[in-house]
Amino acid sequence: MNSENSFSSSEHITVLLHEAVNGLALKENGIYIDGTFGRGGHSRFILSQLSSNGRLIAVDRDPRAIAEAHKIQDLRFQIEHNSFSHIPEICDKLNLVGKIDGILLDLGVSSPQLDEAERGFSFMKDGPLDMRMDTTQGLSAEEWLKQVSIEDLTWVLKTFGEERFAKRIATAIVDFNKSAVKNSTEFLSRTSQLAELISQAVPFKDKHKHPATRSFQAIRIFINSELDELESLLNSALDMLAPEGRLSIISFHSLEDRMVKHFMKKQSKGEDIPKGLPLREDQIQRNQKLRIIGKAIQPSDAEIQANPRSRSAILRVAERI
């Protein structure tokens, strides 16, 4: 094991480290996928539990995560620069479809991404309005906000941020950029500008939450197609897993968690059988594909105290039947 494979660093504390990896029920010779490498906390811990015959494929779309992954000098490990929705293509390329013993996902934005002002994820640090997890492709938040309509932005803020003042905020943003065109002034281009504009548009302030919190979340989710990515992975994950292969998924907001919970529940229940059929229960084939493992797990008080950003995390685990 390379000496660099520590489980955390000064800049990033891995959330639910032991719980998420334990959820995989690691086999020492198994083949695993870390779909969200980040800064490598989960990957390094998985590697520490595998034998020389084990294998770990890590995936991330953030170029900085890829650079961090290249520090791991381990023949059992490989990194793929891609989003986790492309795990099926990666498995197909490596001839691993149906052979994966576990897939781990740690959804959302990482602490380093939040802390690096130039990434544009945080309203707490002034930086360019970017918000892309993969800075090599796609529209930045600034570029998208220049062209979006009030109606479309309202929908995004409501759908992905559950923002009650979505119409007010959307109107303020679109009007600001329209005014910039008319008066030849600068468009919204900084996180601090956007946060201040949102704050002014919101009539009532929550004592415990910055008024820009939900809007920043919504714009980030839209820019990165986060829920589409998750839905795509969930729809294909079962075909990637070997029998008894595990899904271990950490989510950080209710939209993600509802998707994961609904998927696992549906696949563990199997197909609905029309009522009234002349069949006994033992004759019904429901085609169940997953078994839910335990209850949802949240961080301990000690973990939350050590890492307040872990507060909203929730882990769900299921096993392929």
Swiss-Prot record:
Subcellular location: Cytoplasm
Keywords carried by this UniProt record: Cytoplasm, Methyltransferase, rRNA processing, S-adenosyl-L-methionine, Transferase
EC number: 2.1.1.199
SUPFAM superfamilies: Putative methyltransferase TM0872, insert domain (SSF81799), S-adenosyl-L-methionine-dependent methyltransferases (SSF53335)
Catalysed reaction, written as an equation: cytidine(1402) in 16S rRNA + S-adenosyl-L-methionine = N(4)-methylcytidine(1402) in 16S rRNA + S-adenosyl-L-homocysteine + H(+)
Main subcellular localisation: cytoplasm
TM regions (residue ranges): none
GO molecular function, one term: rRNA (cytosine-N4-)-methyltransferase activity
Enzyme class at the top of the EC tree: transferase
Chain positions recorded as S-adenosyl-L-methionine binding sites: 40-42, 60, 84, 106, 113
Family named by the database record: Belongs to the methyltransferase superfamily. RsmH family.
Its biological purpose: Specifically methylates the N4 position of cytidine in position 1402 (C1402) of 16S rRNA.
Protein name per the record: Ribosomal RNA small subunit methyltransferase H
Species annotation: Haemophilus influenzae (strain PittEE)
Gene responsible for this protein: rsmH
